[in-house]
Every structure is written in C-alpha cells, then in structure tokens.
Amino acid sequence: RDSRECTPWENYQLTKESPQLAVELASRAAEGAKELFAGELKVSVIIPSKDNPEVLEKCLHSLTRRSEGRIPVEILLVDNGSSAENKQKTEELIGRIRESGVPVRYIYEPAEFNFSTMCNRGAELAEGKFLLFLNDDIEVCGNGWLDKMVIRAMQPYVGSVGLKLYYPDSVKI
C-alpha cells in the first residue's frame, strides 16, 4: 500500500514524482466532482430522538432550510418509544417536512434508550453514500455546510468529518 494515500496533499514533499502525484490527485478530485454534480451522492441524516417534538422541529427546519445544495438528502428519524402524544406530533411534523419535498423516514421502535443502537439502526436503513449523525437539539446555522463536508469526506485520506458546535447566540464551543 502506498503511504501517500493516507497523507493529506498539503503534506506531500516535492520530489521528482510530484507532477505524477498532482495529476493523480486532480483526477481523484475530478471523479468526486463528477459524482457530486451528477447527483449520484446522497447523504443520509440520522437523527435519534424521543419525546422531543418541539426541539426536533427546530432541528428539522434548520436542516431543510440550510441544506439546499447540490447533494440530495434523506432524513431518518429514529424514535425509540415516544409517548403516543409526542409520536403524533412527530408524525405531523414529518408530514410537513415531506410536503416540502424532503424524504423522511420515521423509524419507531419502542425500546430502552441506547444512543448507539438508535444510530446503528438508522445506518442499517440508510441509502446514502455518506452518513450524517445529528442530535435532535442541533440547529444548522450556515449555508453550504453540507456540500463542504461531503467534498472533504470524499478525499481518499479522510475517514470522518465534523463541525464545530456553538452554544446559541455565542461564539463559544
């Protein structure tokens, strides 16, 4: 295995093979861009949630408003047993989100709370090439963020990508 595959391009030393390496990296980037612009990529957003429809609503609205890029998104909401009242509120919320054209799947499986099990269940059902795990109390606050994350995730030396989480009305993380 070529050790260069695991090294970010900024760290490559200039050698006699640098031109060949530059062509290879440009070729990989072009292939990724081709997939990106052809709409062949999809991001599966997995959101574990239970008994939190008001907070979830803010999350979903910010996600759908701020994810208008080139990359298709599907949302998988994994609920491990909300009350009947909160389940109904969540289903109504999902209906409104679906009306806006965003595909949402609601996985309702009552069980003891286990965050990793909920995430894994969403991952099992996901159809996207990329998985985005998002807590239900997160609000997206910038445009173009998803495109930027996917472009970085497509690099051959990247295993995962994350963002800074800020407290509301603050620059503190």
Describe every region a protein language model picked out.
Residues 1-41:
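Non-catalytic membrane-proximal stalk/linker segments that position and tether the catalytic domains
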Residues 43-55, 59, 66, 78, ...:
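A conserved hydrophobic helix/loop-capping motif in glycosyltransferases and polysaccharide synthases
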Residues 64-108:
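Acidic donor-binding segment of Leloir-type glycosyltransferases
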Residues 80, 134-136:
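Active-site acidic Asp-centered loop
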Residues 109-126:
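Glycine-rich, basic loop-to-helix element that forms the pyrophosphate-binding segment
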Residues 131:
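Short aromatic/hydrophobic "clamp" motif used to bind/position activated sugar donors
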Residues 138-173:
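Conserved donor NDP-sugar-binding/catalytic core segment of glycosyltransferases
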